[in-house]
């Protein structure tokens, strides 16, 4: 730094401003409905989410879909500065928790509207388990970077295994949580939907599956 405190303060201020301007992009992940098997429908929904949530705000977005282990997700990388008249705007979009939640809720609305138009029986709820009154712990999402870092992948997998075990204990004591969960996932749900969720929560263990099912 400078010996002169005024110059030093200006230098630090300039550095802070520079570092602040370095954040030119942000990422977001969205779970996609398992019910959509048609690739053309999945593409149509994805493009609609990108257009309505990002492009309409002047943001440039790059996206990719992944279906790892039957868990389809949409990954989006977008600019923080809108594209205006052939250049990036001087002002940067404020990307905080509130803004990300706003985008997530809009994406859920778009996904649900698309499902109604195409006749799918699903319902996406962007609210947290807590806000929905569901006493379960959400699992950690393993981002694309984690798949390239063995230690990170192992750590997240270990955490998710612990979460799975804690949720099982909760469900065995309060099996009604499964009904509350399924009710937020479907427009109309059936016994088969409940059984699928029970099987998923049991992790394929038939003993646990039968035990959970018997308590509903």
Language model segments and positions:
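Glycine-rich, often proline-containing surface loops adjacent to acidic residues and nearby aromatics
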Residues: 21-31
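Broad gene-expression machinery/nucleic-acid interaction feature
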Residues: 25-27, 58-62, 71-75
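A short, contiguous, amphipathic alpha-helix enriched in charged residues
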Residues: 34-65, 101-110
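Solvent-exposed residues in well-ordered beta-strands and their adjoining turns
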Residues: 31-35, 79
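Single-stranded nucleic-acid nicking/binding segments centered on His-rich, glycine/basic loops
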Residues: 1-21, 39, 65-72, 79-216
């Amino acid at each position: 730094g400078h010996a002169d405190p005024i110059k030093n303060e200006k230098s630090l201020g300039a550095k802070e401003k520079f570092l602040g301007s370095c954040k030119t992009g942000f990422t977001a992940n969205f779970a996609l409905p398992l019910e959509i098997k048609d690739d053309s429908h999945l593409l149509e929904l994805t493009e609609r989410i990108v257009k309505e949530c990002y492009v309409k705000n002047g943001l440039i977005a790059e996206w990719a879909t992944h279906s790892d282990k039957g868990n389809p997700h949409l990954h989006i990388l977008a600019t923080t500065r809108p594209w205006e008249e052939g250049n990036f705007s001087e002002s940067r979009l404020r990307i905080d928790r509130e803004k990300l939640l706003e985008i997530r809720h809009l994406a859920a609305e778009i996904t649900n509207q698309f499902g109604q138009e195409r006749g799918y029986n699903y319902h996406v709820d962007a609210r947290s388990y807590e806000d929905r009154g569901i006493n379960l712990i959400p699992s950690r999402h393993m981002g694309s970077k984690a798949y390239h870092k063995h230690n990170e992948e192992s750590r997240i997998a270990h955490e998710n295994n612990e979460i799975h075990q804690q949720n099982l204990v909760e469900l065995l004591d309060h099996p009604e949580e499964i009904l509350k969960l399924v009710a937020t996932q479907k427009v109309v749900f059936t016994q088969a939907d409940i059984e699928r969720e029970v099987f998923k929560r049991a992790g394929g263990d038939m003993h646990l599956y039968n035990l959970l099912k018997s308590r509903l």
